[in-house]
Amino acid sequence: CSGADLTTIGTLSPEDSRDYIIDNYKPILNNFLSLRKPIIGAINGTAAGVGAAFALACDFRVMSKESALLYAFINIGLGPDGGASWLLSRQVGYSKALEIATGGKRVLGEECFKLGLTNKLVESKEIIDVAKSWAIELSKKPTIGIGITKQDMIFSLNNDLLSTIEFEAKEQVAAFYSEDLKEGVTAFLEKRKANFKGK
């Protein structure tokens, strides 16, 4: 994703540009975070500007050495938008995030892997296949449990330990009514692999 269309942004007033960002990017990022299924980003090429934010909003990322993230905002005189600062700083910490955002340079796949910005580093031709294979692997797990785990992790980003314990306990209730929990416990007791159905 190459980011925002600068020909469109350039024709907007500052107030209209602000409204465009809030009205368009906020709902997309909210959907990324509230979806109770993991999102795997297959980044084949350079994800720039808000495209980098969308990439980091994915729960998991697959990249190649040639893939890159580019916080290009600074290169045209802007600061980050679309939640890009929130997403990057939580991945790599304040100082490294500031370095990347003010540097305006491509962060290649290998560096992304070292920084924890991508989960898997593969050959370019394998990106889609690896992402699909990972998605299939995740689909065989208890989807209610995965949804709970994703929400727990997101909640923990902005809350203390004791609040997180309470949140986890409340979220866990949904799993207690699931067929997957019954299957998981039965499979464990019978020393066999569980056959989860996502129910």
Question: What spans do the regions from the language model cover?
Answer:
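Short, charged, surface-exposed hinge/linker loops at domain edges
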Residues: 150-159
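Crotonase-fold acyl-CoA enzyme core
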Residues: 30-146, 169, 173-178, 182-186, ...
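Glycine- (often His-adjacent) and acidic-residue-rich active-site loop
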Residues: 1-31, 47, 77, 160
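Short C-terminal tail/terminal secondary-structure segment
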Residues: 157, 193-199
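Hydrophobic aliphatic residues
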Residues: 10-13, 92, 153
